[in-house]
Amino acid sequence: MMDGDIRVNTYDDGSTDFQTGEQKIRNFNLNFGPQHPAAHGVLRLVLELDGEICERCDPHIGLLHRGTEKLMESRTYLQNLPYFDRLDYVGTMNQEHAWCLAIERMTGTDVPRRAQLIRVLYCEIGRILNHLLNVTTQALDVGALTPPLWGFEEREKLMIFYERASGARLHAAYFRPGGVHQDLPPELIEDIDTWAHEFPQMLDDIDGLLSENRIFKQRNVDIGVVTEEDIQNWGFSGVMVRGSGFAWDLRRAQPYECYDEFEFQIPVGKNGDCYDRYLCRMAEMRESTKIIHQACEKLRNEPGEIMSRGKMSPPSRGDMKTSMEALIHHFKLYTEGFHVPEGEIYACVEAPKGEFGVFLVADGTNKPYRAKLRAPGFAHLQAMDYLCKGHQLADVSAVLGSLDIVFGEVDR
């Protein structure tokens, strides 16, 4: 009993409510998703609301779980590569990159310079693909209809660059342990460079629509603030870290491939809110465009091999027609696959959403003993309850949009 006529009732599930005379006050539970258009895939949030205020946010995951890590244990290293396109299916080649890096470090393979440049070029195209989708759909989540239409127009052009390099628009499977599948024709490099000259104009258009838009700022400023302590507690990475003022980027902090040769800035925010994360992504697209220019220039001037020659790469067609050993090598490579020496390694890349890592345990056979995938979106989604507490129901979709979550990598 409480003082006066206010009594507390306790229920079997441990929840309580207050009874004031005849009236009961109990928090309202609401399902957000998995069919909700702002849920970015198959996310289900169980929200506990006190009026309009979100008291608790419980993410339910697993609706896109396919057991990728277990499936990888029964496939050869090369057969596992396409699984990585299906994790974060918005900016695909960055995930392939992490897998190839892990295998190359385990086997001590040196990637030819031209292949490194092609990888950097296509990883940055993937970064722009990702940020274009995120920035424009974040705008859609808070009520702006035009940016997604403009963003998808540019994404279509980038998808065609993917298709011209690999034959596929989305699931490219273009990287290989030891290099890339095939060389880029000179016309493609020219077309990418031309596109990169025109793209900043489109960014200026989106900038003009959103950055100083009163409604967009009201919906995003001071929403979902992330502090230095939160970053360490929740394991944030990528834009979630840089939006709070910390210039942590694996391309600079732990350079891989030939990123240390490129000139680019690391955009950082100041307040760590949804709006600063949006500004970081906009600035990152401009920096990626600079890297694309530099990569195209280097590719024009540096012809060469695109695969390291050895047991991990297929022989040329010409060799296979004249050499029995080359034919046997080709057959064994695509049936049994190459063997990776025993050991374990962690390889990570600065994917568009944050640090995407692969912890690979090899037992000396042609299949991985265990591969653990470290998806950035998984760590970010964990913090939904923490970030949404005390905000209004309408702010939940703004926070979700700024986390940049794709369910392929969260559920795996």
UniProtKB/Swiss-Prot annotation:
Q: Where in the cell is it found?
A: Cell inner membrane
Q: What UniProt keywords are attached to this protein's entry?
A: Cell inner membrane, Cell membrane, Membrane, NAD, Quinone, Translocase, Transport, Ubiquinone
Q: Which GO terms describe its molecular function?
A: NAD binding; NADH:ubiquinone reductase (non-electrogenic) activity; quinone binding
Domain of life, source organism = Bacteria
Its UniProt entry gives the catalysed reaction(s) as: a quinone + NADH + 5 H(+)(in) = a quinol + NAD(+) + 4 H(+)(out)
| EC number from the UniProt entry | 7.1.1.-
Identify the enzyme class: translocase
Pfam families, sorted: Complex1_49kDa
Under SUPFAM superfamilies, the record lists:
HydB/Nqo4-like
Q: Which PROSITE patterns match?
A: COMPLEX1_49K
Q: Which Gene3D superfamilies match?
A: Cytochrome-c3 Hydrogenase, chain B
The record gives the membrane topology as:
Peripheral membrane protein
PANTHER family, from UniProt?
NADH DEHYDROGENASE [UBIQUINONE] IRON-SULFUR PROTEIN 2, MITOCHONDRIAL (PTHR11993:SF10), NADH-UBIQUINONE OXIDOREDUCTASE 49 KDA SUBUNIT (PTHR11993)
Q: What does this protein do?
A: NDH-1 shuttles electrons from NADH, via FMN and iron-sulfur (Fe-S) centers, to quinones in the respiratory chain. The immediate electron acceptor for the enzyme in this species is believed to be ubiquinone. Couples the redox reaction to proton translocation (for every two electrons transferred, four hydrogen ions are translocated across the cytoplasmic membrane), and thus conserves the redox energy in a proton gradient.
Q: How does it assemble?
A: NDH-1 is composed of 14 different subunits. Subunits NuoB, C, D, E, F, and G constitute the peripheral sector of the complex.
User: Which family, according to UniProt?
Assistant: Belongs to the complex I 49 kDa subunit family.
Q: What is this protein called?
A: NADH-quinone oxidoreductase subunit D
